[in-house]
């Protein structure tokens, strides 16, 4: 579909890469430090299954990567909060890549296609809005969830050495880099593309879009209207 093609092209065009078209090389001195919790490219309709990272150069001290277990984070929510999350979806966009027009809507709780386990699927880097809530409610719930997944008991921290390779499942984890180092840090990354995200439950309400006069908070409503218009137009275009 057209939007998916644009998303793939954007990723390739806007990311530095080596001579191999599917290996992306990122250097800290050129802004390549992912120091915000995230799951890779959730702004795509079919986000990545997994990522493979090769550490080319790293500082002796600092620059560790942390991962958090989103299945455990969901399991340890209270039952009412689990039920609230399972009945909602969220809008993700590529604003950190200067492309806020590239958007996708995914369930807040997804099912792992191989294990059947449920996990939270929102992150502070790409997730903008819970679709079925107004802006104030969405900000409160997203703020809680994105803070909750950082709980130390869900996380692991790894200190790199040159030549190390890490592989992780993007369907049930988030990660981030501790930006606490000086000097250069160079990684090479391969991202394995995925399938449609499967929801743990169907949404319990229609999208909440504020109509009428514009306000400071209505930018999210305009963004959602843009998303739904684009989706409807793509359906018409076939």
Regions found by a protein language model. Give the residues of each.
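Single conserved hydrophobic/aromatic residue that forms the stacking wall/gate
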Residues: 1-12
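Short, acidic/turn-prone active-site loops that include or flank metal/cofactor-
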Residues: 15-17
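Active-site environment of non-heme Fe oxygenases that use a 2-His-1-carboxylate facial triad
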Residues: 19-155, 159, 165-167, 171-238
